[in-house]
């Protein structure tokens, strides 16, 4: 974000507050394009493109998204990024949760970095590899000029030897990758099935390691559900 120094940013929301915080340091204006509940929080690409006509130069997407657990399919991403390329809009896609998607290849934008120079994809080890304390992340872009400029301004010693060693071991541990996907995806499907049996909840399609619910019982709050989970009632 600092290297791109955007002037007018659109954020696909609701989502992390950290994007907004980082943008505040760069001086960019920022607005949200909110996913709609009536669409199960899936993106209307054509509608978003109409909004992007209003002079934005930077677009931020979390895919799969937190907190909706919804995802944008790769073909829709291609259409969106191509539109942005024609409008000189740079697209940043955070794929922190992509390893939890039922079909990673259907969701990831990484292959699109070979097609578009206005794209950067971010990933990390905090969620799937359960290592938030490592503070280890990486970016993928096909824009060599942009990459060179980022390297010029890279903080010295931004990756320590422990992080480099652990990160390599994590990303090459294919057995962990397979077993973790089997466990999380299996448990998520089981949870979705059981929750759908309860009329008090509306269950939205999930692509991350969490499920978004709408409470449909009058007087029942999220705090009540939380306490029921803690004491084993639910």
Protein language model regions, located:
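Helix C-cap/helix->beta junction micro-motif
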Residues: 26, 86-87, 116
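PLP-dependent aminotransferase class I/II
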Residues: 20-21, 118-204
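Active-site phosphate-binding strand-loop segment of PLP-dependent enzymes
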Residues: 31, 39-101
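Conserved PLP-binding catalytic core of the aspartate aminotransferase-like
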Residues: 184-185, 195-232
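Substrate-binding/gating loop at the entrance of the active-site cleft, primarily
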Residues: 11-28, 157
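Phosphate-binding glycine-rich loop
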Residues: 1-8
